[in-house]
Amino acid sequence: MGKAFATCMDNFRRWFASPKIYVVFVLILIMQDSMMIAPIRRFARDMNLGVAPWIYPFLPMDWYICMLEAVGAIFLFCDSPMVNAGTPYLFMRTGRRAWLGGQIMYVLLAALAYQILFLLSSVLLVLPQLEFTPQWGKTLGSLAQTNIGYWEYGITLSGSLVRRFTPMQAMALSFSLRWMVTALLGMLLLCMNLFLPRVFGMIAGGAIALLHPTAINASGTFLYYISPASWTALDYVNVSGGSDTSAMALFPDLTYIRITGMAILLALILISFLGFRKKSIYSLSTT
């Protein structure tokens, strides 16, 4: 466990010298601010209102933000497992299983860091108007339950989210689902990169990212069941299970999403360990 953790931390240390990490950070800030948070700030300023720190669960409701969040995760994990000139020496020092365990640990923790970055930036970007309240607040409530945001500021927030969840419920559920999907994308790339040129992993990840807008524009709800990115948008998650008789009953329920997502995640981890048993570290693709 100690050697796996050391391998994981070695990957994180490379973040400071990686331009890719800074690109992902800037992408997150620009994406959130331009597509959702800047209009919320303008509304709050014009109405002389504060903004509650609960924007995070609204973000994936915008299909473009949802898709770009998946693309950012693909960009973050496209070079997993991290291989450079010193990797063979680290591999010999730690051992095969510990090295791969460290790579998997890195994916899980980096997915956590990725979502923490989304959450913190959604709060920091409204600092001038930030208002601490356990409720949704007047700004988010007004934008979610009226059309004033659409006509005056070009933004619409989910009224369904406000009606179905308290802020803390929405934050906790959104964070857990988005971490799971980010980790799933990371493990898919890691698993495929162990055995195939890295371009194939990026193609597979890109296909998953594009499933969400495809599901929105398709007739029926079948694609929502096979689109992990869609599972991060709570408007497309049936939290009531079989007891829901509304239109929400057509969407995948929370139990299905959790079981399916974790099953895929564990399957990818198992495939990685089993398939890597006799693979040479020198055979790993870096392109």
Task: Give the residues covered by each predicted segment.
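Aromatic- and glycine-rich beta-strand/loop motifs that create alpha-glucan
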Residues: 1-27
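Transmembrane helix boundary and interhelical loop/hinge segments in multi-pass membrane proteins
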Residues: 76-92, 96
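Interfacial transmembrane-helix starts/ends
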Residues: 8-12, 16, 97-109
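Membrane-helix interface segments
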Residues: 19, 95-97, 197-203
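Transmembrane helix segments
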Residues: 35, 196-226
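Central hydrophobic cores of alpha-helical transmembrane segments
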Residues: 24-29, 200-213, 231, 286-287
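Secretory targeting signals
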Residues: 32-80, 101-190, 194, 227-260
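Junction motif at the cytosolic side of a transmembrane helix
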Residues: 191, 195, 262-287
